[in-house]
Amino acid sequence: MIEGDVISVCKPALGARIFNIWTALKGEEVDVYRLSGFSKVRRDDILVFNFPYSEWNQWDENMKMNISNYYVKRCVAVPGDTLFIHDGIYMIGDGNVLAGNIESQKRIMKFNPDNIPDDQYYTLPFDSIVRWNIREFGPFYIPGKNDSIPMNRTNYLLYKKIIVWEQGEEVLFQDEKVYLGNKELDGYRFKSNYYFMSGDNSMNSVDSRFWGLIPEDFIVGKATLVITSRSRDTGKIRWNRVFKRIE
């Protein structure tokens, strides 16, 4: 997809969402109920979802469903996957499964890291010890509903915002222990499914490498078709893109 595309989104595929839109527009948390769909999210699906923060560049705050801001990205990892990036290439599990736009990912290795600004090179969890970046990242387990993880410093850094969003309480790391409110956490069981989203232009995409995983509740549906496309520069319709299938 390119700028100027107008796309159709298939909501019944995953099941349409039902929630109080007026409450969501006020910036308040809402319960989301999803109708039964006829398919699940799969790797390489192009998804439309609500951005997980109130502002584009404020992903140091707590997660929330931004009902006014929609993103379109490729899903490269689903619940149960372990994702890692080596030499810029997205890999699943033991590395036998590649994910995303590989040709775009290969171009990352052509750039000298010294010439890339830190805020574009280093990724979550933005930690001086867990020093992940756009070339070397992970392993990062993508949790599903009822999956459990042990709580340690690394998992605290990786999953803190998810836990806060699910529980509505702050999570702290103190004296080598993790606390949810005043309660010590030895482990955590997730309440939802999560997905890793990536832009096809890997070098210039702001995606799950930076702002983290997307809860299933935030997903609107699958992008399926370019209905029409108009150049912002000329105002003319790009007829070669009209009714083009999104892949």
Predicted regions and their residues:
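Soluble "head" domains of membrane/secretory-pathway proteins
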Residues: I2-E247
